[in-house]
Amino acid sequence: MIESDSDTSDDAPQEYVSASANIPAQFELATAHMKATPEPQPTQQPDAEALHDDDPLTTTQDHPTGPSATASDTIDSTPQPMAPATLSASAVLPSLPSDTAALLETFSQQLQQSNVKCQLKFRPIGGATPSLKQSVYKIAETQQFGVVVKFLRKQLKIKNSQSSQIFCYISSFAPGLDETVGSLYNRYAIRGELTISYCLNQAFG
C-alpha cells in the first residue's frame, strides 16, 4: 500500500508537469492562429449617387423618373399682362357731371315733348276754297309750321307753283314756316284746339 502510494505520488507530479507543459504550447498555437487570421477591414459604404441609381425607394426629388422640367413647370415671377377692362367691369360713377346731367335732362324733356300731340282744326275761308273731308288732325308739337302747310297742300292736291298757292292764318296773321307748332299752340289754342284758317287767295295784308 505504501508503494502504491509512492507510485501514485511519483506519477502525479509527472501528469501535473505534463499538463502544465502543454499550456504554453496551446497558447502559442492560439497566438499563431490570431496572427495568421487577417484583421477584418471596415465595410466601405457605397456612394450616395450609386445608391440612388439602384435604390427603388428614391423620391422624385432625388432621382426623377419623369421627363425633365419644362418652362411651364417653372415658377415665373414676370407679371402677366392685364386684360382690357370690359364694360361690366368699368367703374360706376355715383353721379354724372353737371354738364352731362343737364344735357340728359334737356334730351329727356325733348323726348317727352316729341310725344306730345297738338290738335289742329282746319277751317276754309272763301266760297272757292275746298274743304277737307276731315277737319281735325293731330301733330307733334315739335314739328314746324311748314310741315302743316305741306300736309294741307297734299290733302287738297294743290301744286306748289306761282299760279296755285295756299295761304294759312292763325287768327289774323300768317305764321312763319320755321315756327314750331307747340309754340303756336301754347299761345293761340282755344279749348284745346289750334284753329288754322286757309284759303287759295291772300286774305289778310
Swiss-Prot record:
Keywords: Autophagy, Isopeptide bond, Membrane, Protein transport, Transport, Ubl conjugation pathway
Ranges of Acidic residues composition bias in the record: 1-13
GO MF term list: protein tag activity
Record GO biological process: autophagosome assembly; autophagosome maturation; autophagy of mitochondrion; glycophagy; piecemeal microautophagy of the nucleus; protein transport
Gene3D superfamilies tied to this protein: Phosphatidylinositol 3-kinase Catalytic Subunit, Chain A, domain 1
Top-level taxon in the UniProt lineage: Eukaryota
InterPro entries registered for this protein in UniProt: Atg12 (IPR007242), Ubiquitin-like_domsf (IPR029071)
Location in or out of the cell: Preautophagosomal structure membrane
Topology versus the membrane: Peripheral membrane protein
A Pfam family per the record: APG12
Biased composition (Polar residues): 57-80
Record's signal peptide: none
GO cellular component: Atg12-Atg5-Atg16 complex; autophagosome membrane; phagophore assembly site membrane
Segments for region (Disordered): 1-86
Annotated crosslink Glycyl lysine isopeptide (Gly-Lys) (interchain with K-112 in ATG5) location: G205
Complex and partners: Forms a conjugate with ATG5.
Function: Ubiquitin-like protein involved in cytoplasm to vacuole transport (Cvt), autophagy vesicles formation, mitophagy, and nucleophagy. Conjugation with ATG5 through a ubiquitin-like conjugating system involving also ATG7 as an E1-like activating enzyme and ATG10 as an E2-like conjugating enzyme, is essential for its function. The ATG12-ATG5 conjugate functions as an E3-like enzyme which is required for lipidation of ATG8 and ATG8 association to the vesicle membranes.
Protein name, as recorded: Ubiquitin-like protein ATG12
Organism field: Yarrowia lipolytica (strain CLIB 122 / E 150)
Lineage: Eukaryota, Fungi, Dikarya, Ascomycota, Saccharomycotina
Gene field: ATG12
